[in-house]
Amino acid sequence: MEHEVTERLSVAGRVQGVGFRPSVCRMAKELKLTGTVQNLGGEVEIYITGAREKIDTFLCGLKQMERPALVECVKREERPLTPFSAFTSIPSRESENKMFAPADISVCSACLKEMKTQGNRRCHYPYISCTACGPRYTVLKKLPYDRENTAFDAYPLCDQCYEEYRDMNNRRCHGETIACHDCGPRLLAKMRGSPSAGPWSREELLQSAKDLLLHGEIIMVKSVGGYNLVCRGDRDDAVQRLRILKQRRDKPFALLVATVGEAEKLCHISREEKELLESPQKPIVLLKRRRESMPLISPAVTELTESLGVFLPPFGLYALLAEIKIPLVVTSCNFTGEPIIYKQADAFAFYESHESISALFYDEREILRPADDSVTRIAAGAVQILRRTRGYMPEPVAVEKKGMRVLALGGEVEPSFALSVNDLIYSAQVPSDLTLEKSSAFYRRLVADWEELLHISPDILVCDLHPCYTTAEESRKLAKELDVPVLEVQHHHGHALSVMAEHHLDGKCLAVIFDGTGFGTDGTVWGGEFLLCEDRSFIRVGAVKPISMISGDESVRQAWKSLLCHLVHSGIPSDDKRAAVVKAAVAGGLNTVKSSSMGRLFDAVSAALGLADYNTYQGRCAMLLENQAALAKRERKIPTELSFNEEVVETENGSVTFFDPAPLWEKVMGEDKAAAALGFHEAVIRIVERMAEKTGVETVILSGGCFANRLLLEGCVEALKGKGHAVYWNQALPPGDGGLAFGQAWYGMNTANERKSYVCSISGACGNH
């Protein structure tokens, strides 16, 4: 008989809400091992008895478990020999500081197959799920993740589902959100000119939804994390009516397609992009458009010709709707700047007040907190998350060192917040406009909800340096209530820290931070920054040369003002009738501020090329400029030769290299738009190369909203790696302000409890940035 031992295994990773414990039980029984498995909230604890060789085999199986499970770390220790009669799963218990809230997981292939199989008892059941898929975060009342702690507690299991739930050999064993036609949520509808709730059969409702879409109507659909508006994406009239309804003039829509094969009719798809489309998160993936796809979708879907946002069905109902084999526009049901509608009463009110919506399809399952669709892409050979919401939120990101409990409240433009405990940072992105009271109130509620859900009471708060951000004001208010200190982190340093935290960097690095705006330590507006970072400190060693820019939120949206300010600075005349007013304002210092913004420079070049004068949505002008540059690359155009002037200024903190874009303007205007757009991108890449060469630092960080630009990111990565640099950028977190709170939290985790002060020389800072 083989010598037996007992071991305790502590397993960390994505092991909650993914059918991990039943899989562990099956594996142990196959190997004739005995013991127990228990969910501790943030990890899984296994006691296992058997031959050491079999336990080794068991461990290998754990690490190779299929997604969505992901084993990141196993701590193994021998314990006194303990005889067990069998291998069993025992009830969950909470573990101090080990709370883990699982993310929603898109419908899996096994459930899709069942849902589309005639005769299966879940055939055409829109809310099908198993241990490998289904809602989690959006239906979770409290931890640990057990059925009685979710919105599915309102749906007692029928006898058949209960047997599946108990059967350790069934893939629905301990599936906390499993249901069927007999015991789970039901598809319901409101239709114009029909009785308020039917009665209609499930098949009638599904067919009605498909028929309405085929006829070009707009329908409202309850998804996993909120309500969506849906129409067919190949009809101009339908998409234009949707734009009017949403008050969304230009911002691109994403398209839902049934399969990767359908997506390939519209876009070029690499192996990595296919994996991302089919991943458990089912995010929107930004893909390169096929030229032949133009007739297949309405031009009203997007004004961009080179890229398209596409995603596969994240849950059963969308998989059934996508069977019509027409690309569907799916967008959040809200107005621009407001959070997605997720409460039933609000959804009913929205439907009743908008007659252009032909029907509302819903169920009575309660959504406890919303989650918009995530947005991703493959860039420089890696996944880049641009919006980290459904499927990713609230899963934490592990950092290298344990630290204090921190609440970080991010910036202003792309609201986010983060909570940290031990070596984990939980980061949330809140797509909304905090200048709107409804959005600001929602943001505050969500912060409080996460604190309660994760059992985290912060020891310290961290906010942006800008004195008048809503989030900074909220930080000061909360700090007073909780009697804890507040740390302020300079905006671009926060971006740098987000990359350092994600990639476990603490040595000296050059951080290249390009974005639209951020309050600088000198009281001016920063945005085209080169920061020499080490540990948690930084020195500004370079920047786009600051010029006088007309301030105010509206001016930030007006690319033509950015252009005219640059022309005034460069001494280049303009025949624009508005130029005289701008020149006088700059000369007199009237409502102006010094700015080194790279984002505003992208806007100015876009306006100079006649691509766009106004940001009707965030980043529009820069996206159109990138689109033209991508067009030039596809058509193999020779880029216009453009350059910056370089000058060195001595300051009390050392030398600062400024890059003046003045030489750009005479060459840009009047040139081939696509060639000039590509030339501008290459000029920016060259100044990044130049600063890396000047500083001699091996490690380079790329962050800030401008690095959502794939051409810029990939160009910088390729150029820097070609010169032997180690290059890091945001991948698990967004490069823009959506990832800012993550960097702030990391700063706070490892900083003494004292307020950090910066000297600011600007007057009237509020409202000028």
Give the ranges of each region predicted by the language model.
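A contiguous, well-structured pocket-lining segment that forms one wall/lid of small-molecule binding clefts
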Residues: 177, 184-186, 411-449, 470, ...
